[in-house]
């Protein structure tokens, strides 16, 4: 089946699909203060989703393209779940968030099919994959249309990988007690086995969102990158997120001696946001298998245990947490009790001495990850490094921070 035909099959016009903002039924906190963060974007009045311009631009989307799609959503007069929120149009039609971003992705998909230059075609496929992922954002469980967009993103990503520099292998990993999971191993030019970074992504992202990290930072240094989806989304959708948050990544780590392209004696983990929860757990539980662990904006304690901090977080992000935990109908009180169990300090890990070198990067006044969380990580390590990343200029400092983190990882791997 061609890519175009697959799109038509998946996205037949229907209007009974549940609208994304209705999937998690929590009691609302009411009015919330505006939130802005480098990794998560910011709350904008009249939008349910956080608008994450920095990360979307970093992944290769033109700012004008973002504004164009937003404008189409705003201008729609179709029925909405909440008339006050632009991105709550019901059904797969004009104005619906998933429809508009997927439509934009199909434009690039068609460009990719028409392009004769393999590298340029690969770029177009990658662009389409990124747009399909934005269509599926924030990847809530039970969002049928979003899951269809994710399927198209994965297909486009595989097409891109066949044409872009280096090599990518789709790999299946067995996990006892449940379904196998699929990961992508990105390898630079040259002969392996390669030193490798195991990517632990955020809860509102897919594993295919991190190609820029590999291409700009790891590949030029001869480092491979292995990604898997976080529990409950994408290729890991059959696994629920539990307090043993690092379960899937641990099984992948244990399988690496059997992967011929990976030098299993030179492996590091890199965690974004909640992915840092996974990475730091690995630092404690699998220290013989890891040379280093790096974190960026870690969610390891405060957000999970501090009610005041949770009150500052946008509704969408709390919906993401509830969705990952399988608590779609839970009260806020029940969600708070459960989140507390995910704190690595409450679990008795953070605060204990850890032999694995750990770096943690943070932004001042980050509503999701205060400086104290990063200090807790680095002070627990026998070889800790704290990295403050200035907020403005946001894009340049984000790039500089990633360069410093990659330097630090490279010294411990190579």
Swiss-Prot record:
What Pfam families does its record include? FrsA-like (PF06500)
Top enzyme class of this protein? Answer: hydrolase
Per its record, the protein catalyses: a carboxylic ester + H2O = an alcohol + a carboxylate + H(+)
Q: Name one GO molecular function term.
A: carboxylesterase activity
Q: Which UniProt keywords apply?
A: Hydrolase, Serine esterase
Q: What is its EC number?
A: 3.1.1.1
Which Gene3D superfamilies does the UniProt record give? alpha/beta hydrolase
Q: Which family does it belong to?
A: Belongs to the FrsA family.
Task: State the function annotated in the UniProt record.
Answer: Catalyzes the hydrolysis of esters.
What this protein is called in its record is Esterase FrsA
Origin species, per record, is Escherichia coli O1:K1 / APEC
Q: Which gene encodes it?
A: frsA
């Amino acid at each position: 089946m061609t890519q175009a035909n697959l799109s038509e099959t998946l996205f037949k016009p229907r209007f009974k699909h549940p609208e994304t903002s209705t999937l998690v039924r929590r009691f609302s906190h009411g009015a919330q203060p505006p939130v802005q963060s480098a990794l998560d974007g910011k709350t904008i009045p009249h939008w349910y989703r956080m608008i994450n311009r920095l990360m979307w631009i970093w992944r290769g989307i033109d700012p004008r393209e973002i504004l164009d799609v937003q404008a189409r959503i705003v201008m729609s007069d179709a029925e909405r779940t909440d008339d006050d929120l632009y991105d709550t149009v019901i059904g797969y039609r004009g104005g619906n968030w998933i429809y508009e971003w997927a439509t934009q992705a199909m434009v690039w998909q068609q460009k990719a099919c028409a392009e004769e230059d393999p590298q340029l075609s690969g770029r177009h496929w990658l662009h389409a994959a990124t747009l399909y992922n934005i269509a599926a954002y924030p990847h809530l469980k039970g969002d049928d249309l979003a899951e269809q967009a994710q399927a198209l993103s994965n297909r486009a990503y595989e097409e891109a990988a066949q044409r872009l520099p280096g090599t990518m292998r789709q790999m299946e990993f067995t996990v006892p007690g449940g379904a196998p999971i699929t990961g992508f191993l990105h390898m630079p030019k040259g002969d392996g086995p390669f030193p490798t970074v195991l990517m632990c992504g955020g809860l509102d992202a897919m594993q295919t969102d991190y190609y820029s990290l590999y291409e700009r930072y790891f590949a030029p240094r001869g480092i491979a990158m292995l990604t898997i989806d976080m529990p409950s989304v994408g290729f890991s959708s059959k696994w629920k997120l539990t307090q043993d948050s690092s379960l899937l990544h641990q099984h992948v780590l244990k399988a690496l001696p059997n992967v011929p392209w990976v030098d299993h004696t030179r492996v590091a983990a890199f965690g974004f946001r909640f992915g840092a929860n996974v990475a730091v757990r690995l630092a404690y539980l699998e220290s013989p298998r890891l040379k280093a662990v790096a974190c960026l904006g870690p969610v390891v304690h405060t957000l999970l245990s501090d009610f005041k901090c949770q009150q500052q977080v946008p509704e969408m992000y709390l919906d993401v947490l509830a969705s990952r935990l399988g608590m779609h109908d839970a009260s806020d009180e029940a969600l708070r009790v459960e989140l507390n169990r995910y704190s690595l300090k409450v679990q008795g890990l953070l605060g204990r001495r850890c032999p694995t070198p750990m770096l943690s990067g943070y932004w001042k006044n980050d509503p999701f990850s205060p400086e104290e969380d990063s200090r807790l990580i680095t002070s627990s390590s026998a070889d800790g490094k704290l990295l403050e990343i200035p907020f403005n200029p946001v894009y340049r400092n984000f790039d500089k921070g990633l360069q410093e983190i990659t330097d630090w990882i490279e010294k411990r791997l190579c």
